[in-house]
Amino acid sequence: MTVLKPSHWRVLAELADGLPQHVSQLARMADMKPQQLNGFWQQMPAHIRGLLRQHDGYWRLVRPLAVFDAEGLRELGERSGFQTALKHECASSNDEILELARIAPDKAHKTICVTHLQSKGRGRQGRKWSHRLGECLMFSFGWVFDRPQYELGSLSPVAAVACRRALSRLGLKTQIKWPNDLVVGRDKLGGILIETVRTGGKTVAVVGIGINFVLPKEVENAASVQSLFQTASRRGNADAAVLLETLLAELDAVLLQYARDGFAPFVAEYQAANRDHGKAVLLLRDGETVFEGTVKGVDGQGVLHLETAEGKQTVVSGEISLRSDDRPVSVPKRRDSERFLLLDGGNSRLKWAWVENGTFATVGSAPYRDLSPLGAEWAEKVDGNVRIVGCAVCGEFKKAQVQEQLARKIEWLPSSAQALGIRNHYRHPEEHGSDRWFNALGSRRFSRNACVVVSCGTAVTVDALTDDGHYLGGTIMPGFHLMKESLAVRTANLNRHAGKRYPFPTTTGNAVASGMMDAVCGSVMMMHGRLKEKTGAGKPVDVIITGGGAAKVAEALPPAFLAENTVRVADNLVIHGLLNLIAAEGGESEHT
C-alpha cells in the first residue's frame, strides 16, 4: 500500500500530535543527519507532505493525525486493560482479531489491533471503508461472551452508545443512525462492524470501529473529530491517543454491563441519540426500498420499530440500510394538461418556473433592470394553455415591469386566512407579506413536522409553522446587505468590506461578517427554541431555509444544533408554495 519504512513511521508518529519537534530529535529517530530530513520527508504520501511546517529548526504538522507508535500504544493499552498490536498496514484489523479468535479465543478477549492502512477495510454489508493514511482512527478488538451468537443482535447499537459516550466526554456532540453509525446530522463520523466466532461454547465478538479523525477530502457527507473539536471551541488540537483511550474506557464499561444485563439498560439512551427517531425514513435492501415510514424506536433486542402505511413493522439490521426520506412531500397532480408560469417577485430579483404536469420544467431569474430573459422565454414557450400565477412583495412599479414582458394577465396572489389546511394567525392577513405565506405553504413539500421557515433575501424572515397546520407568525430583520449598508451609512469607521466569519474575529471586517451571521443564526435558533417549547412532547422541529444566503446560514449554525435537528436548504420555496396551491385537487384553490 505504501513504501514507508520503519523510520518513516517513527517520525510520523512523533509529529502526529501536531506539536513542534526539533529536527535533531527527528533525525535521531530516522537514523540520519538533520540535513537529510527534507529528502526523507519527500518520500511521505502527498497528502502528508503538504502538512509540514518548518520554523527555527522545528518541524510540526498543521493538523494532527491518527498515527501511533508501538510503545505508546502498549502503554495506553496497559492503562485501559487491553493487550495491543500495531499494524501499520494490513488487510483488515477485524481479520487480525478474527484469526486470533479462531486460534486462541481467550487471548482475543480485550486484545486490540490498531492499523493505519487497510487494503480490505470494510463496513456493514461488505461496503469498502475508504481512508487515507492518518485520516481515520481504525481498530478492532475481541470480547468473549457466554452467550450464543443469536443473543448478541443488539451488540452493534450498544457499541455505538459507548462510542457516543466517549465522544461526549471529549465535548463532541454526535448522534446514532440505526443501527450503529456515528453521525453529525447528515454527515457520517464513524461506523462499527461486528463479526463473531463461536468456539468452545462461547462467542467471540470482534468489534471493528472506524472514526474519521481528520475530515476526508475525497468522501462526501463526512464529519471528523478534528472539525468537531474546532467548532466546539476547544483549545489546542484533538489527540488520537486521548480519543482512543477514552473510547476503550467507555467500551470496557458498557460491554461489561451489556454482558450482564443485555441492551435493556441502554434503550432510553439509544432512543435519545437516534438521529431519525420520529422522522420519515426509507429502508433499503440491495438499493431497493422495502419499507418506508416513521421511526418509532428500538426495543430491548435492538430491533427497529417502524410505523408504515400498512401498519407497524419490526426490522432487524441484517442486510437492511436506513436512509432519511428526503423526497418532497407529494401534491396532487392536475387532471388536465394546463401549464403554468409561476412568478416570485422578490425585492431585488424576479424568479420564475414553468410547470408542466405538476412539476418544474425550467426555472429562471433576472434583476428588474433587465427582464428580457423572461420575455424571451415567454415568446418561445407560450401557447394558449398557459396560466400565470405569482406572489410579489416588490411593489406596483416592478409588477408592472413584469407584466410588460408577458402578453397575458398575471394572477398575483396575496396572503390569506387559510390555505391547504394551514391557518394563518397573522392579525391582519392582508398586511402579511405574501412571500412569507407562500414560503410556509412551500415548506410542506419538504417536511410535515413543525418547521422554522427562514428566507434570506433583502430582508431575513424567520417564521413558525406547527405540525398540525398553524402558521404562528414570525420575525423580520434586515438582510446581510442591508445590515452592512446601515453600518456603512451610520458609523464613521465601519464602511469597509465584510470579511469572513470566525468564532472570535480579530479584524473589523471579520467582526462585521461574523456579527451579521450570528444575528441571523441567533434569530433562527431563538425561534426554533420557542417553537420547540410550544410543540412539546419531544416532537421534532425542522428548519427549512431558502434564499440567496441560505447555504451560508445553514453552514454557520452550530454543529450541536445541526446534529440534533433537521436543517434543509430549499431553493425557490415561494414557487413551491404556489405549486402546492395550484396543484390542489381539481386545481381549485382553498385560498380564502
UniProtKB/Swiss-Prot annotation:
BPL/LPL catalytic domain ranges (all copies): 83-259
Keywords annotated in UniProt: ATP-binding, Biotin, Coenzyme A biosynthesis, Cytoplasm, Kinase, Ligase, Multifunctional enzyme, Nucleotide-binding, Potassium, Transferase
Pathway: Cofactor biosynthesis; coenzyme A biosynthesis; CoA from (R)-pantothenate: step 1/5
Ligase among keywords: yes
One of the Pfam families matching this protein, by short name: BPL_LplA_LipB
Catalytic activity from the UniProt record: biotin + L-lysyl-[protein] + ATP = N(6)-biotinyl-L-lysyl-[protein] + AMP + diphosphate + H(+); (R)-pantothenate + ATP = (R)-4'-phosphopantothenate + ADP + H(+)
Biotin--protein ligase: annotated span: 1-329
One Gene Ontology CC term in the entry: cytoplasm
GO function term, MF aspect, one: pantothenate kinase activity
Binding site for substrate: Y426, G433, S434, D435, R436, T508
Record's cofactor remark: A monovalent cation. Ammonium or potassium.
Active-site positions on this chain: D435
UniProt binding sites for ATP: D344, G345, G346, N347, S348, R349, L350, K351, T458
Family to which the UniProt record says this protein belongs: In the N-terminal section; belongs to the biotin--protein ligase family.
Cited function: Activates biotin to form biotinyl-5'-adenylate and transfers the biotin moiety to biotin-accepting proteins. Catalyzes the phosphorylation of pantothenate (Pan), the first step in CoA biosynthesis.
Protein name: Bifunctional enzyme BirA/CoaX
